[in-house]
UniProtKB/Swiss-Prot annotation:
Membrane topology term: Lipid-anchor
GO cellular component, one term: cell outer membrane
Protein name: Outer surface protein A
Highest taxon above the source species: Bacteria
Family named by the database record: Belongs to the OspA lipoprotein family.
Compartments, record wording: Cell outer membrane; Cell surface
Covalent lipidation (N-palmitoyl cysteine), chain numbering: 17
SUPFAM superfamilies membership: Outer surface protein
Main location group: membrane
Species classification: Bacteria, Pseudomonadati, Spirochaetota, Spirochaetia, Spirochaetales
Keywords noted in UniProt: Cell outer membrane, Lipoprotein, Membrane, Palmitate, Plasmid, Signal
Length: 273
């Protein structure tokens, strides 16, 4: 009888271990906050394999996984009704989450979103072949850079949403170019794939006395505008994804006053006049 009861107890214990992932609740787990306003439940005890059980709910889909750590890091997976697969990867230090949706084959990407603790994120969408067609990068300061209609050669459309206005342009395999036009003047802001910003100014004005030119200084991220060999304005493209404008004196030798942040598209166009 004792052997029988011992056997039953062992079976029940094994079942309990196997059910760790499917039976997590507030009593036997700890809730951990993750980037992207997600939460993961982590079992208080290890399972039979010496791992901690993980559970999270994303868009009403329950994801499950295991981890060697009890801090919430690890990989969780689930399957949608259409048989597509969802995979959530939580970094070891909990600073980033990567949410992937894949086709039934488990290899072809449908979408992918990486979210950081500072609330910045990169979201990608793919076509039927698993080729990238859209990429949205939300920065920690709330500004957004979007690439849409991406073709196989890397070309497409680009849009940057700053605090109060939007810049639009084109995308190539090497960079995004955002353009603002005012009269005969065209301001182009280039953003490389690594995030480096440069700017240039072109003027189709045929009169040399009023024709504007621009010189870029990579060290200070400044575009200096010159008219008739005199410096007139300095546009600074800051690391905070803003643009400031400051005027030169009448001689074109020294900057006057203080730099003013450009807050609207009209203000940016005025700076090009």
């Amino acid at each position: 009888m004792k052997k029988y009861l011992l056997g039953i107890g062992l079976i029940l214990a094994l079942i309990a271990c196997k059910q760790n992932v499917s039976s997590l609740d507030e009593k036997n787990s700890v809730s951990v906050d993750l980037p992207g306003e997600m939460k993961v439940l982590v079992s208080k005890e290890k399972d039979k394999d010496g791992k901690y059980s993980l559970m999270a709910t994303v868009d009403k889909l329950e994801l499950k996984g295991t981890s060697d750590k009890n801090n919430g890091s690890g990989v969780l997976e689930g399957v949608k009704a259409d048989k597509s697969k969802v995979k959530l990867t939580v970094s070891d230090d909990l600073s980033t989450t990567t949410l992937e949706v894949l086709k039934e084959d488990g290899k072809t990407l449908v979408s992918k979103k990486r979210t950081s603790k500072d609330k910045s994120s990169t979201e990608e969408k793919f076509n039927e072949k698993g080729e990238l067609v859209e990429k949205i990068m939300a920065r920690a300061n709330g500004t957004i850079l979007e690439y849409t209609g991406i073709k196989s050669d890397g070309s497409g459309k680009a849009k940057e949403t700053l605090k109060e206005y939007v810049l639009e342009g084109t995308l190539t395999a090497e960079k995004a170019t955002l353009v603002v036009k005012e009269g005969t003047v065209t301001l182009s802001k280039h953003i490389s794939k690594s995030g480096e910003v440069t700017a240039e100014l072109n003027d189709t004005d045929s009169t040399q006395a009023t024709k504007k030119t621009g010189k870029w200084d990579a060290g200070t991220s400044t575009l200096t505008i010159t008219v008739n060999n005199k410096k007139t304005k300095a546009l600074v493209f800051t690391k905070q994804d803003t643009i400031t404008s400051q005027k030169y004196d009448s001689a074109g030798t020294n900057l006057e006053g203080t730099a003013v942040e450009i807050k609207t598209l009209d203000e940016l166009k005025n700076a090009l006049r």
